[in-house]
Amino acid sequence: DAKGGVIMPAFINAHEHIYSSFARGLSIKGYNPQGFLDILDGQWWTIDRHLTLEQTKLSAYATYIDSIKNGVTTVFDHHASFGHITGSLNAIEEAAKDLGIRTCLCYEISDRDGMEKSRESVMENVNFIKHALADDSDMIAGMMGMHASFTISDETMELCNELKPEGVGYHIHVAEGIYDLHQCLKEHGKRIVDRLYDWNILGPKTLLGH
């Protein structure tokens, strides 16, 4: 008896940002961004640079509880917490397992905070992917996360290709803003998707966000 309701398959959220869950509806006094990059650097990147592991985990609880309440049983998350990279995906996983929701996690690799943090974010992906591949519960998976073409150098692209475990795809933003395209044409002489194709990023297991 559905009691007047409709029974249907559960929803899948194919691109989520758990780290931003506590910023929904956020209004910052005196903050008037003038464009895409202003919004990224003035709000989202500022938030992710200050997240602790505990805050990341609490953000995951908030997102997953909201997902379950709205019929979402699988979440693909594209995470960033450059203030505390290592262990952040495991913190999110703990919340997912506690609530019984299926999730596929990745960390958004980016050179925007320097090459040391970029490499650390690569290793966070690699280590979590290996951990997820060894898990036989069918409730957790990993992907190679990347922020966007305009914050990823050829050096980092090469490192990702070299270290990505077999059998998984990439999860990356593509043309979220026109700046991404303009920068790619200026810096690399090609469009974003062409650059990703040349670096073997594309494929049946890769997700392109936006």
Regions found by a protein language model. Name each.
Residues A10-E16:
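Metallo-beta-lactamase
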Residues H79, H84-G209:
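Metal-coordinating catalytic core of metallo-dependent amide/deamination hydrolases
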Residues D1, G209-H210:
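Short, intrinsically disordered, charge-balanced linker/junction segments flanking boundaries
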Residues D1-M8:
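Histidine-rich, glycine-flanked metal-binding segment
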Residues G4, V72, K205:
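Phosphate-coordination loops involved in phosphoryl transfer and adenosine-cofactor binding
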Residues I7, L26-H78, G83-I101, V122-S137:
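Alpha-helical scaffold segments that flank or form the walls of functional sites
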Residues I18-S20, E176:
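Short active-site segment of divalent metal-dependent hydrolases/proteases
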Residues F11, T73, G169:
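Hydrophobic "anchor" residues on beta-strands that sit immediately upstream
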